[in-house]
UniProtKB/Swiss-Prot annotation:
Chain ranges of the HTH marR-type domain: 9-139
Gene designation per UniProt: sarZ
Organismal lineage: Bacteria, Bacillati, Bacillota, Bacilli, Bacillales
UniProt DNA-binding residue ranges: 55-78
Protein known as: HTH-type transcriptional regulator SarZ
Coiled coil: none
Gene Ontology cellular component list: cytoplasm
Superkingdom: Bacteria
Subcellular location, principal: cytoplasm
Compartments reported by the entry: Cytoplasm
Physiological role: Activates transcription of virulence factors alpha- and beta hemolysin genes (hla and hlb). Also, activates RNAIII expression, a central regulator transcribed from the agr locus.
Stated induction or repression of this protein's expression: Transcriptionally activated by CvfA.
Alphabetic keyword roster: Activator, Cytoplasm, DNA-binding, Transcription, Transcription regulation, Virulence
Length: 148
């Protein structure tokens, strides 16, 4: 039970933790239909339909390292959502792109955000304010390319 005046209720990290955990739980309920994890979902949504990008660029977009992305991309490839191809100029460089099935699934996956939003007791304006504030917070405080 959430206690508004508790020590934790005043801690930014705790509020982010609870929000993230509960939002991901809601997404997970919808993603089961597609046999996707939340991480798989964000990876698919991060790749534009006709785009090829390498693991490093994809990792920067979703704040994941290659050690996490590689096994996930293998699973997504087995499900025929993505294809991994070696770059001709540099065989060490893997290019990731969506398959036709991966492109087709993006529209129903995008609808999940609307379904999840409708489960929350906030207005569109409040949601927009939260998104803008979090975008600002992330851009000012986190740069994935700085990670080693």
């Amino acid at each position: 039970m959430y206690v508004e005046n508790s020590y934790l209720s005043k801690q930014l990290c705790f509020l982010f933790y609870v929000s993230s955990k509960e939002i991901i739980k809601k997404y997970t309920n919808y993603l089961k239909e597609y046999d996707l994890t939340y991480t798989g979902y964000i990876v698919l949504m991060a790749i534009e339909n006709d785009e090829k990008l390498n693991i490093k660029k994809l990792g920067e977009r979703v704040f994941l390292d290659s050690g996490t992305l590689t096994p996930l991309l293998k699973k997504l490839e087995k499900k025929d959502y993505v294809v991994r191809t070696r770059e001709e100029k540099d065989e060490r460089n893997l290019q990731i792109s969506l398959t036709e099935q991966g492109k087709a699934i993006k529209s129903p996956l995008a609808e999940i955000s609307v379904k999840v939003f409708n489960e929350f007791n906030i207005s569109e304006r409040e949601a927009s304010d939260i998104i803008n504030n979090l975008r600002n917070f992330v851009s000012k405080n986190f740069d994935y390319s700085d990670r080693k």
